[in-house]
A protein has these predicted regions:
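ATP-binding N-terminal substructure of ATP-dependent carboxylate-amine bond-forming enzymes
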Residues: 1-57, 61-63, 67-70, 74, ...
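Active-site nucleotide/adenylate-binding loops and adjacent lid/helix of ATP-dependent enzymes
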Residues: 16-20, 61-154, 211
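Glycine-rich phosphate/pyrophosphate-binding beta-alpha loops
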Residues: 32, 119, 175-179, 245
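Short hydrophobic/aromatic-enriched beta-strand-loop microsegments
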Residues: 50-54, 79, 169
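Conserved metal-phosphate-binding beta-hairpin within the catalytic cores
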Residues: 149, 159-161, 217-245
Length: 245
């Protein structure tokens, strides 16, 4: 990605600091806050350094699960039923928050900090006590908490996307987690999870998730490369876009 240059920053690339780096291109192999939320991408833009991957906008949207779901829905992509809880609401009246979640989504639900990666702070709540604990945990990490209805018998599907304006999608893969869901421990600690490539999907379902991956990538104004995650209802076959990474 080549940063857009205007008159105001025309000389930034000629500064001693940038010249001293001796870089032709930056490939940011970074994760989480500051690394993939648009912060370092903004730094590259200011320094007029070409870099690989999503720009400031796509990175910021891709980090904020709540904003991302709104964008997906606006583009006509199906997302699992969800609601946003603010930490101040939880602190002020936990009982009201719990009641609203159950009334709106029922149980079970997944509770997630809106702006973290690697499934940090994510819990599956199956009862009222579990819901309280899950919201309290997520509130330790973020002021914005996403609560999402659990997709029945969910299959975790992922598709790689490559390109800028002309975008290509890989075949879909399927994650078989070693735990109840693909949480932090399943991703990084135990080695029991499996990845099936290609995912065992019917041709029509494979085509659907690949097209939805391209649509989701374009919805957030993606660039370079990304992984788009889906949840597939094991009973109905419905496909829900989960997030772009």
């Amino acid at each position: 990605r080549t940063p857009a240059r205007g008159d105001a920053d025309a000389d930034l690339a000629d500064t001693a600091i940038v010249r001293g780096l001796g870089l032709d291109l930056v490939f940011p192999v970074l994760h989480g806050p500051y690394g993939e939320d648009g912060t370092v991408q903004g730094l590259f833009e200011l320094a007029n350094l070409p870099y690989v991957g999503a720009g400031v906008l796509a990175s910021a949207v891709g980090m904020d699960k709540a904003v991302m779901k709104v964008v997906f829905a606006a583009r006509g992509l199906r997302v699992a039923p969800w609601m946003l809880v603010m930490r101040r609401e939880w602190i002020a009246d936990p009982a009201d928050v719990v009641a609203r979640v159950i009334d709106t989504l029922g149980l079970p639900v997944f509770v997630k900090p809106s702006n973290l990666g690697s499934s940090v702070g994510i819990s599956k709540a199956k009862d009222v006590n579990g819901l309280r604990e899950a919201i309290a945990l997520a509130a330790e990490y973020d002021r914005k908490i996403v609560v999402e209805a659990a997709v029945p018998h969910a299959r975790e599907i992922e598709v790689a996307v490559l390109g800028n304006d002309d975008v290509e999608a890989s075949v879909a893969g399927e994650i078989i987690p070693s735990r109840e869901f693909y949480d932090y421990e399943a991703k990084y600690i135990d080695a029991g999870s499996k990845l099936l490539i290609p995912a065992p999907l019917a041709p029509a379902a494979m085509d659907e998730v690949r097209q939805h991956a391209i649509d989701a990538f374009r919805a957030v104004d993606g660039a370079g490369l990304a992984r788009v995650d889906f949840l597939l209802d094991g009973q109905s076959g419905e496909v829900f876009v989960n997030e772009v990474n």
